[in-house]
Amino acid sequence: YISVNSKPEDLSASKTVARKFINKFLQKNKDFQVEEIDLYKEHIPRLEYQYFEKRNCIVNEDDAKKLNDKDQKEVQRIRALCDQFISANVYVISAPMWSLSFPAPLKEYIDCIMQDQKTIKFEGKKIEPLLNDKPRTMVYIQSSGGNVPWMLRPILNKGLNYVEDIIKFMGIKKFEELLVDDTGFTEEEKQEAINKAYEKIDDIIDSMKF
């Protein structure tokens, strides 16, 4: 579970819906364990040129030893984030819509997990996905203050579209969106949006295959 919101859970519509989703998912899939990462609390490295030996490929362990201590720790952290992502079967991201996109920490996280020979591979001039090795599902839970008409979503919902594209680019074929739209300005409006999102949870969970 990847949360991308600095608000406490009880103040965040996206995190509130995500928690409900996770709890219901675990009720129906008792063999699963949840790992949680809060991108506002965890350290997500900002990628520097010296961390790479080639495009989208982190330096190998021998070359990493030539870096200073700080850079070595950053490379180790990038590897750990990528390996953690690869190990999962189901991914849940909760994020608000900000400026037609999402908060910046999510992009920094995605940059860390887009790694050659890990989540993608280069075959000549072609890029091949590597996360199509088993059934995987991404559930993207997004809150927004207004209600974006479905006809305008390709234009206005750029963050959601980007996440879906990049996830499928890595080979995760099943992408589900759970939108908490029209949270408005009052607590009543927010709760109504949350309740509407709750109604969609069971159908999404029941559609998953492992």
Per-segment meaning from a language model:
Residues V4-S6, S143, V180:
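Cofactor-binding loop segments of dinucleotide-utilizing enzymes, especially the Rossmann-like FAD-
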Residues S6-D10, N147, G184-F185:
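Short histidine/acidic/glycine/proline-rich micro-motifs that form metal-
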Residues Y40-E42, S144, D181-T183:
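Short, solvent-exposed coil/turn elements at secondary-structure transition points
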